[in-house]
């Protein structure tokens, strides 16, 4: 279904992952996030490299299930269980619908990431998720993920970032704006969505992410994918 949520000049409310967003999320993310499909493919590649037999894979902020599918399809390891978690009942419902008939080793759970226990985890993924968690809760979450990950397990985080250099930030923001225009979003839609989401999606810089990984205990962390202001990080325990 095509995303036309922000086509009208209505009173804007803060962006939320409700039924309206769940129904158009796949279209929204493909038209808003540069190289989104490549980002998903990199997750699949990382699982092949760092997944372990007889362990769990966690998809935190599972949304409509694209990451869980990447974790499950072409997985060369054996006896893995995927735990797909989202705190939006509407997203959980859509995720269950999308996963039906595609992968069967998955549990879809509605819950809060901050309350989740990670057991026997070789892979933990936050795909465009951490940016929606309150900044003052992020370090504690990454600390806990590091503690709970199996040795040689991997944390994969994909995020929108900002640049501390204002000139670079302006350049990349302009390119991202043109990306959205090229994908059919009008000026009204772009403006409305920005106003709706700006207090909900809080970005970090690359430097902040790497500092957070280091403070948690990760000694091996890299940015292994980037397109414009969207990046993926790989941190191995």
From Swiss-Prot:
Its EC number is 2.1.3.-. GO terms for molecular function: carboxyl- or carbamoyltransferase activity; S-adenosyl-L-methionine binding. One of its GO terms (biological process) is tRNA wobble uridine modification. It holds the Pfam family Methyltransf_31. S-adenosyl-L-methionine binds at residues 36, 61-63, 86-87, 112-113, 127, 194. Homodimer. Belongs to the class I-like SAM-binding methyltransferase superfamily. Cx-SAM synthase family. This is Carboxy-S-adenosyl-L-methionine synthase.
